[in-house]
From Swiss-Prot:
Gene Ontology terms for molecular function: ATP binding; protein serine kinase activity; protein serine/threonine kinase activity
Native organism: Clostridium acetobutylicum (strain ATCC 824 / DSM 792 / JCM 1419 / IAM 19013 / LMG 5710 / NBRC 13948 / NRRL B-527 / VKM B-1787 / 2291 / W)
Name under which the protein is recorded: Probable serine/threonine-protein kinase CA_C1728
CDD domains according to UniProt: PASTA_pknB (cd06577), STKc_PknB_like (cd14014)
Family statement drawn from the similarity comment of this UniProt entry: Belongs to the protein kinase superfamily. Ser/Thr protein kinase family.
Pfam family, one: PASTA
Active site residues of this protein: 143 (proton acceptor)
Domain called PASTA: residue spans: 375-441, 443-509, 512-577
E.C. numbers: 2.7.11.1
Region (Disordered): 286-334, 581-657
Family matches, as InterPro entries: Kinase-like_dom_sf, PASTA_dom, Prot_kinase_dom, Protein_kinase_ATP_BS, Ser/Thr_kinase_AS
Amino acid sequence: MIGTVLSNRYKIEEEIGVGGTAVVYKAMDTLLNRHVAVKVLKHEFTEDEEFVFKFKREASAAARIANANIVNIYDVGADGNVNYIVMEYVAGKTLKKLIKENGKIEFNKIIDYATQIAKALNFAHKNGIVHRDIKPHNIMVTDDDIIKVTDFGIAKASNESTITTTNKVVGSAHYLSPEQAQGIPVDCRTDIYSFGIVLYEMATGKVPYDADTPVSIALKHIQDAAVPPNELNKDIPIALNKMILRCIEKKPENRYQNANEILDELSNVKNNYVNDDEEFTRVMDPAQIQNESNPNNKLDNDDTYYNGEPYNKEQPQEEPQEENEEPKNKIKGNNMLSGKAKKALVASIIVVLILAGSALAFSMGSGIFKPNSNSVSKVKVPKIIGLSESDAKGKVEDAKLKFQVVDRVKSSKPKGTVVTCYPNEDTEVDSGTVVRVDISSGDTDQTLPSLVGLPESAARAQIKQYGCNVGSVTQEYSDDVAQGNVISQSPSEGSQIKKGMTIDLVISRGPEVKKATVPSVYGKTSDSASSILQNAGFGVNVQNKDVTNADQNGIVIEEYPNGYVNKGTTVTIVIGRFNSTAVQPPNNNNGNGNQNQNQNKTPDTNHDDSKAPTGGNNDNQNQNNTTNPNGTQPAGGNVTGTGNGNVTNTPNGTGQK
């Protein structure tokens, strides 16, 4: 790819990164003369038409968002079978590289970086974009400590289907949320989980879950409790420790519900920072330990705690218990396993049971691991889409689940009926799980967003996304809008959208190229000529040239180009510089003794007695010597100008008329 020019515009210069789905190159935008980053979809994905379509559509959706902490997307396109996204080029390091170089990051920078990342997520989420692959590899840090989150180009617009139905694993197992690992539909809270993992890594220098294979890592996300970060780094304040643990809660409803809540919490952590060393040593009973370990200070109905760490109560215990018997947490005798040993044993049993009993549906379409259908506490989400809100609530509660209305959305479905639900219908979930639904508001009209400033391809993709058609596309010159981007649209932003409606676009041709006649500046001084040309809208390039005519010294003797040319063209002017010793071309007088009066004479540098006789022309210094018939000037000969303006050389050095 190096040296390739995509779409006659983006010249690939060097490879700067490789991801799961694409290769990223540094390139030169030859139109705007700036460096950009070009993400090229890997060849194995280009064969999947559905993937390519969604890749472009989601990148176009992400191009709508412009934020100081998000890498801007400039263009989406294809050149032959090469599909690419053009992004802002950021000079700096990835957060992953900084962590590798420094280990853990100090407290103030953690808060600073986390705040900027949360601002980026908050902005994207408010615009309907879920990243789904937040990890330090996708977070750039400039030399000025400005955070730039990248890779929104392959993110999922939250109201659209996911692009992960391609049986290709997208993302990194170390940062996957439990719901991603299980193939459950995701929302903005999956980004909050991944953000928590990044926060954990910044604070400790390590990820909370690691193993030899992605499968094993995914299992840990689903089943294992993370080691509290302040056990790995004693300098982490309790408030930050709790915040990290809440971000990485297994259940989305137990996490922060949006990035704005995270921003508030970060502000509190920063303003109320107290080093743990300043606290008095205290003795805590088991209940206190349990409450410290659970940021929400409550037991989930499917969790039990051992030394403050949650385990699934449905997994085998060391001793069988009666159905209604309380868990036996009390350690008796010296032959009992220690807390750490028991944790290792339980974890190993979990792995064995899941590996043996599950189908290991290893694809991102169906999830890395499906929930264990053999669990006695699982229930199915009832079919409620299309039901009224009250009927849906009744069915959900009859199934021993909880009902929550998330939003009322514009939909073609009857007003007051369920449009979507999460988890999906027929999904097996734990008893008591919250089923979140969207209810139809009955209003199907949507408003048209602004397409101004978008590349034409991105604008077309958005129009198609809204179920509309592209109407007339005209082009106009613009000094403000880059070539190929939208200048205006009709109907305008805020107009109500009706399915099938036509939207017209005006596309920029870039700045208008205007022509003008180059003014003649022959005979002008350098400053005067430059001023005249610049005022006429031209650039100026000044050169000097030796001349033997003193009258040409310091003035324009040549000018090019001339005539009718593009405004802004650089005009070269040549300024004469008098040099009496400048070499002249050889003459061709053939010894006839006569020269044109306008020609120049090269003075004899060996004698100073050259002079014009009385009554002769005084122009003899501008005339050329005439050589004797044999083409040579005798040594020591003098040159004397004659009255008729002709000069001849004689052997004895006397001039003759």
